[in-house]
Amino acid sequence: MKPEIISLLISFMDKVVLAILVGLITSGMFLCILSRCRPTIDISPIIAKGADTISGRTIYRIKVINRTKSPIVDIKSQLHVFKNHQTATGEIWKSKTVQLKRSDPIVIDKYDKLDADVNYAYRFVTYEDLEKIWDNDNVQFLRFRIYARHSISGFGAFAYRDYRLKRNTIRSGEFSKGDNFEIA
């Protein structure tokens, strides 16, 4: 081959390889930065038991706080009662769904301490009698699960909380407004 063709081929390969390498590195950096934009969700360690303001029926509430600096979307939540069953080959856990009245809000706003309406907090509610359903701490527990996506990055996050002891979990009262899980 002629030296000019070899020089042209080396120059072309140098530019292509360099462009591909730079593209891969910048894409990796972008994904690394973007992957840090995941929802951060806190779930209350206790369940508030109160009366519905309209019907007066007993209502149970689980409060979540979106700690992310952006809104979270595509929210899905579940509450289950898990029960331990002994079988010939060992133990298994069976679950029963507890119906949540508002289990999939469209959005929970970004975390903002200056938000007077506290739109970054949300209360999931059920009218099912948790104290009746959850009748034995030795073989049963409650599990609340939530999945949400970050509104900007699209990355999802899953959070859950297990409630193991009924006497430490269910408290009479209402959650206080704001960035806390206190029951008043």
Predicted ranges, named:
Residues M1-S35:
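Membrane-embedded hydrophobic alpha-helical segments
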